[in-house]
From Swiss-Prot:
Residues 1-106, 155-162 are cytoplasmic. This is NEDD4 family-interacting protein 1. May play a role in Golgi structure maintenance. It is a multi-pass membrane protein. A motif (PPxY motif 1) lies at residues 29-32. A motif (PPxY motif 2) lies at residues 54-57. The chain crosses the membrane at residues 107-127, 134-154, 163-183. GO terms for cellular component: Golgi membrane. It is found in: Golgi apparatus membrane. Keywords: Golgi apparatus, Membrane, Repeat, Transmembrane, Transmembrane helix. Residues 1-13 have a biased composition (Polar residues). Its main location: Golgi. GO terms for biological process: metal ion transport; vacuolar transport.
């Protein structure tokens, strides 16, 4: 009886196991050697696409140092013409310092009469004591008119006989010289006096007066 039961409960062979083994073998990853052989062409293709490669030793050693790179960067940030931005600041009018350098009509008339009445002494005093354009141009103009005055006095006075006898060209030279000095001082002051109106809307300008 026991033998019949043992034969009845014999272990059956699993029929699914042989089928799972081929599937497991197909799911296993391929060996590394086969992957390396198949993908070597792909890696070579990526290199040919232009990916950056490290520079050679010669190129790496020829690169600028850190100090040179910083110096180049600092030079690039420096403007080509330094200090020019201050020269282009718009101005509404001349300031007080510019007005003192130009002067006014009162200074011009004062130095004019000083040079005219006191001749060359008044000219040197008024020219050296004043630093404005009006004062110096007034001194020049007054000295020119004073020179004309003395030429006429010497020419037509009976107290100085024989000064221009036979030398009338010298009389004309001094007369023309005095007239030119008078006109130069008067005309130049008239031009300088109009500068505040002409330069009021222009950028800041440095003006050099040549007397």
């Amino acid at each position: 009886m026991s033998e019949q039961s043992s034969s009845r409960y014999q272990q059956l062979q699993n029929e699914e196991e042989p089928g799972e083994n081929p599937q497991a073998s197909t799911d296993a990853p391929p060996p590394y050697s086969s992957i390396a052989g198949e993908s070597s062409g792909l890696f070579d293709y990526k290199d040919e696409l232009g990916f950056p490669k490290p520079p050679s030793y010669n190129v790496a050693t020829s690169l600028p140092s850190y100090d040179e790179a910083e110096r180049t960067k600092a030079e690039a940030t420096i403007p080509l013409v330094p200090g020019r931005d201050d020269d282009f600041v718009a101005r509404d009018d001349f300031d007080d310092a510019d007005q003192l350098r130009i002067g006014n009509d009162g200074i011009f008339m004062l130095t004019f009469f000083m040079a005219f009445l006191f001749n060359w002494i008044g000219f040197f005093l008024s020219f050296c004591l004043t630093s404005s354009a009006a004062g110096r141009y007034g001194a020049i103009s007054g000295f020119g008119l004073s020179l004309i005055k003395w030429i006429l006095i010497v020419r037509f006075s009976t107290y100085f006989p024989g000064y221009f006898d036979g030398q009338y060209w010298l009389w004309w030279v001094f007369l023309v010289l005095g007239f030119l000095l008078f006109l130069r001082g008067f005309i130049n002051y008239a031009k300088v006096r109009k500068m505040p109106d002409n330069f009021s809307t222009l950028p800041r300008t440095r003006v050099l007066f040549i007397y």
